[in-house]
């Protein structure tokens, strides 16, 4: 993976451009994952989109091959927004469609408020707008202290996926990746998110918004996604059935097709 240097360490990203030569100036879709995973979460989206779009993924600061800060690091949404811009600049993406899952989707809403000039559209997936309403976040620090990362990861897997909802191989990869993440990053992101409340600014978002929601997320009831939907004029909402919080992984192809149909509608207007 190529890297981009920032004032706070390197970020690793990957740009896939397999568009055929007759696709002139393909648009870029930038993907931002959430807590306790890496950019591999998007792997099954790529085949659904790469014939027409440049696919830009990266390991969010704190995960994967990107810089892993220590416990003293001061996390902020603005700092993570600057990371997104650094990745987009490195990939030559002046404008891009933004897709984010969980915390990453909240980042999309933040960018829609604070960096709208760079965005073509925003697709938040199982994402909050008010961290204080995210269920179970407040228990993370004590739970990790008592049960360790393995115990925390086991509980998270139950909340991300229905039993048998993903293949054995993908379940093994996800659980292993999640449990090996830095607890400092997980707690830093979780506690940062608790302080985020974008509620009063959602109505100012003018870029097209396509919300993808799981019908059974233990973290985000559909009522929360509906709040976002009702607060952003002309936003769309697609609810994926029989899915928990990890919908972008368990229902990757379905989510990618939902995104593609949304972008196709934008191109026709």
Predicted regions and their residues:
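Flexible "cap/lid" loop of the alpha/beta hydrolase fold
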Residues: 109-114, 118-148
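Acidic catalytic loop of the alpha/beta-hydrolase fold
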Residues: 216-220
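Conserved HGGG/HGGXW glycine-rich cap/lid loop of the alpha/beta-hydrolase fold
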Residues: 9-69
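Conserved acidic catalytic loop of the alpha/beta-hydrolase fold
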Residues: 78-96
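Gly/Ala-rich beta-loop-alpha elbow adjacent to hydrolase catalytic centers
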Residues: 100, 104, 108
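Conserved alpha/beta-hydrolase catalytic His-Asp/Glu region
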Residues: 132-135, 146-203
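Short beta-strand/loop motif that positions the catalytic acidic residue
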Residues: 205, 211-213
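Catalytic histidine-centered segment of alpha/beta-hydrolase-like enzymes
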Residues: 243-256
């Amino acid at each position: 993976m190529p890297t981009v240097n920032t004032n706070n360490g390197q970020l690793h990203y990957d740009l896939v451009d397999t568009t055929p030569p007759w696709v002139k100036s393909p648009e870029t879709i930038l993907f931002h994952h959430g807590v306790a995973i890496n950019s591999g979460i998007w792997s099954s989206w790529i085949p659904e989109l790469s014939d027409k779009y440049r696919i830009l993924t990266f390991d969010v600061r704190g995960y994967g091959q990107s810089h892993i800060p220590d416990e003293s690091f001061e996390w902020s949404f603005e700092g993570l927004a600057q990371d997104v811009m650094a990745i987009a600049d490195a990939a030559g993406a002046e404008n891009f469609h933004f897709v984010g899952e969980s915390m990453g989707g909240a980042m999309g809403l933040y960018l829609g408020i604070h960096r709208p000039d760079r965005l073509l559209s925003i697709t938040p997936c199982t994402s909050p707008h008010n961290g204080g309403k995210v269920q179970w976040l407040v228990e993370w620090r004590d739970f990790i202290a008592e049960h360790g990362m393995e115990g925390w990861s086991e509980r998270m897997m139950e909340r991300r996926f229905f039993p048998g909802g993903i293949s054995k191989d993908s379940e093994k990869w996800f659980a292993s990746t999640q449990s090996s993440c830095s607890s400092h990053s997980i707690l830093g992101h979780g506690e940062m998110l608790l302080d985020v409340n974008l509620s009063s600014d959602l109505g100012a978002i003018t870029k097209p918004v396509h919300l993808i929601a799981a019908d059974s997320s233990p973290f985000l009831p559909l009522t929360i996604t509906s709040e976002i939907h009702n607060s952003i004029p002309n936003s769309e909402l697609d609810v994926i059935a029989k899915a928990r919080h990890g919908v972008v992984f368990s229902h990757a192809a379905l989510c990618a097709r939902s995104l593609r149909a949304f972008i196709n509608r934008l191109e026709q207007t």
